[in-house]
Amino acid sequence: MTLKHRTGNVWRIRKFEQLFRKTSLFNWSLASNPASTLSHVVPDYWRGSANLGSRIMTSSTNWRNDSRGFDQFEWVRDLRAFGGSQARSRARQLIESWIDSNNNWRAGSWQPDIMGQRVANLVFCYDWYAPSAPEDFQAKLTRAIARQARCLALDWPRLYDKTAQLTALKGLFVGQSAFGEKPDGLAALLDLLLPLVDQVTLADGGHKSRMPDIHLKLMRDLVEIRNAASSTGIDTATQLDKKIAQMASICRMWRHADGQFARFNGAGKMAIEAIEETLARIGQRGKILQQAPNSGFIRFSSGRSTVIMD
């Protein structure tokens, strides 16, 4: 799920600091010497689109979609869905090209929420594209992920939007999990994450924006965090499961019979497949919510007719 291009001042980064970040001194501050491969593989829950993967495969060598979408690396899943060794090679070529072009800090491609999404996607899809790659590619990749994770630790609080902060922290959490961070370190990250979840959601589980697409994106982030935590043996059930279940109930409330969200507050652009696979991964089923008093929605049905009201 790709975040849309956003304009305006979304994070605090002064011009002088932007200049400093283009120096070798800043590059040195991010340097580390990670292992040539990730020490822990975090399984991926999401499917890509084979049709989009086919478009990437048949496009020119320098294929790009819009810059923000490309920088998030959702397209790696699309190539994986297309399948085959050629798609795997194409993914490596595009990843390596991005690393070569963005190895040094850039305000756009290194924006914390964009970077958090990218790091998470690189880690989640790692087991598909990386293990059979040449050793020099694997070493370059892990260095790049480690540098970005260190930068995320610095920059996530600079984002003004708290939902964007959660996406950035998700990338940091997934990245640290993949590098074998100790449980205490991961638990400390969860201590930062969980209060933010409460700050951006209402008592009934709805996102404060009341926008279904943003609500679903946050829910997917939380599922990914829970996935990464459980894969490292950290129990998040008491903290995350209740919130995810609440958010899923709101999602079911918004859906028409065809599976699409009611077109409230900019909704209707989310793929039905993304909605369905997200709800399928919740791991819980429940009755369709009839009213969400804090979020301000109500649903009622009679026979084959359903009315969903804002």
Model-derived features: where do they sit?
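Intrinsically disordered, low-complexity regions enriched in Ser/Pro/Gly/Gln/His and often acidic
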Residues: 4, 21, 38-39, 56-57, ...
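Helix N-terminus capping/helix-initiation residues
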Residues: 44-45, 49, 134, 211, ...
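Preference for long, amphipathic alpha-helical scaffolds in soluble/luminal domains
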Residues: 29, 34-56, 85, 151, ...
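Generic secondary-structure transition motif, activating predominantly at the C-termini of alpha-helices
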Residues: 11, 15, 24, 99-103, ...
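Extreme N-terminal leader/anchor segments
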Residues: 1-64
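Aromatic-lined, polymer-binding surfaces characteristic
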Residues: 65-244
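Carbohydrate-active enzyme catalytic cores, enriched for enzymes
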Residues: 202-310
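Generic structural signal of hydrophobic/aromatic residues within well-ordered alpha-helices
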Residues: 7, 16, 42, 91, ...
